[in-house]
Amino acid sequence: MNHLTTLDAGFLKAEDVDRHVSLAIGALAVIEGPAPDQEAFLSSLAQRLRPCTRFGQRLRLRPFDLGAPKWVDDPDFDLGRHVWRIALPRPGNEDQLFELIADLMARRLDRGRPLWEVWVIEGLADSKWAILTKLHHCMADGIAATHLLAGLSDESMSDSFASNIHTTMQSQSASVRRGGFRVNPSEALTASTAVMAGIVRAAKGASEIAAGVLSPAASSLNGPISDLRRYSAAKVPLADVEQVCRKFDVTINDVALAAITESYRNVLIQRGERPRFDSLRTLVPVSTRSNSALSKTDNRVSLMLPNLPVDQENPLQRLRIVHSRLTRAKAGGQRQFGNTLMAIANRLPFPMTAWAVGLLMRLPQRGVVTVATNVPGPRRPLQIMGRRVLDLYPVSPIAMQLRTSVAMLSYADDLYFGILADYDVVADAGQLARGIEDAVARLVAISKRRKVTRRRGALSLVV
């Protein structure tokens, strides 16, 4: 597809509406040394980028949004304009690295060129170096971006991700439309009932999403943002998370969100704010990407808006409430409504949807406090130019009054959390990261001392 979908174009519109927003997603790879020289790196990168034409294309915009932006080949494409090199004062530590990442992610990508950058970062302690890869969100969602980035490694990792992407289920209504008259009336009745049930769920989901967005949240973590950022990160062993999953029959995503909930609860308390039921309404993206669409560079997501239980003091109760609310949200109609809305929007004339999206972006959104996105990453360690990738940190942007975002990515034997925050209002981004690690450790300790017998639950990294 050469034209942006309504969702893809919405990420551009969010930047147009708020000059403080930079909607790039990123991945920070920390790599064993020594760093290659620039010529060798450019040569290797050029070879690996060749299969994906999107890296050599820029957007052609239509005046007054008369048509959807279109990807076109950039006749002036120069790899050297997309690959930059920078060094920390030796020996650079983690805090200095994260400060640099925050600064680089705050800078907008140039729309006159292909919408991506690679930063080679030298000067890390122990002869390590790093690569920050930035892609505009209109170009890819988290899953597509992760597969693109893994493709830059020394070997194809397409079969090595932490979990299979759920195959998007085909609507039963489609089979009714294609099938014409059915011989078996009971089958037609079953299909019609399923369609009506889907419509009812989608309508309920629409009301839930509207209520979530329009109801003001009691939190200082929602409001206008500046053009400066802070970045911090947490890292926990996947084996520890899986132990909690097995003990309490929950998913990896449940444990991760419960840890995030505890960390936000502590931050709110230290700010002198009372954690309430609606203090942490969270946008949780849900992938609708099928396995056959992994190579597509676009956005294929729906959403859920659960209230994470920051008002709950007990860690185990908090975990169980997170599990319960996510289970209900998955079974409810929020995802269905999101899918239906995007399908309808993509069939309407683009000027109409662009105007509607622009109007919605300008409304003061006070109901949602943060975004928490979870992407399955490579199960096996990657190598870049013969050097091991030691750590892989995700970065997701902030926008629409959300002053923090949390991105989660599994890599090899660990689960990584990347926190991007507004510089002026969220000085405690590092505390959020440490709080996540402490919360996971607390759940692990509880799982070791509690004697409960439960069946083994499925472990999944995709909501």
From Swiss-Prot:
Disruption phenotype: No detectable TG under hypoxic growth conditions, or when grown at pH 5.0. However, about 30% of normal levels of TG accumulated when grown in the presence of NO but there was virtually no C(26:0) TG produced. The modification N-acetylmethionine is found at M1. Optimum pH is 4.5. Pathway: Glycerolipid metabolism; triacylglycerol biosynthesis. Induction: A member of the dormancy regulon. Induced in response to reduced oxygen tension (hypoxia), low levels of nitric oxide (NO) and carbon monoxide (CO). It is hoped that this regulon will give insight into the latent, or dormant phase of infection. Also induced when grown at pH 5.0 for 3 weeks. It comes from the Bacteria. The active site is at H137. GO terms for biological process: biological process involved in interaction with host; glycerol metabolic process; glycerolipid biosynthetic process; response to hypoxia; response to nitric oxide; triglyceride biosynthetic process. InterPro entries: Acyl_transf_WS/DGAT (IPR014292), O-acyltransferase_WSD1-like (IPR045034), O-acyltransferase_WSD1_C (IPR009721), O-acyltransferase_WSD1_N (IPR004255). Coiled coil: none annotated. GO terms for molecular function: diacylglycerol O-acyltransferase activity; long-chain-alcohol O-fatty-acyltransferase activity; O-acyltransferase activity. Its EC number is 2.3.1.20. GO terms for cellular component: peptidoglycan-based cell wall; plasma membrane. It catalyses: an acyl-CoA + a 1,2-diacyl-sn-glycerol = a triacyl-sn-glycerol + CoA; di-(9Z)-octadecenoylglycerol + (9Z)-octadecenoyl-CoA = 1,2,3-tri-(9Z-octadecenoyl)-glycerol + CoA. Keywords: Acetylation, Acyltransferase, Glycerol metabolism, Lipid biosynthesis, Lipid metabolism, Transferase. PANTHER family: O-ACYLTRANSFERASE (WSD1-LIKE) FAMILY PROTEIN, WAX ESTER SYNTHASE_DIACYLGLYCEROL ACYLTRANSFERASE 4-RELATED. Catalyzes the terminal and only committed step in triacylglycerol synthesis by using diacylglycerol and fatty acyl CoA as substrates. Required for storage lipid synthesis. Upon expression in E.coli functions as a triacylglycerol synthase, making triacylglycerol (TG) from diolein and long-chain fatty acyl-CoA. Prefers C(26:0)-CoA over C(18:1)-CoA. TG synthesis activity increases in M.tuberculosis upon oxygen depletion and NO treatment, with concomitant accumulation of TG in inclusion bodies. As disruption of the gene encoding this protein obviates TG synthesis this seems to be the major enzyme involved in production of TG. Has no wax synthase activity to produce wax esters. Belongs to the long-chain O-acyltransferase family. This is Probable diacyglycerol O-acyltransferase tgs1. It comes from Mycobacterium tuberculosis (strain ATCC 25618 / H37Rv). The lineage of its organism: Bacteria, Bacillati, Actinomycetota, Actinomycetes, Mycobacteriales.
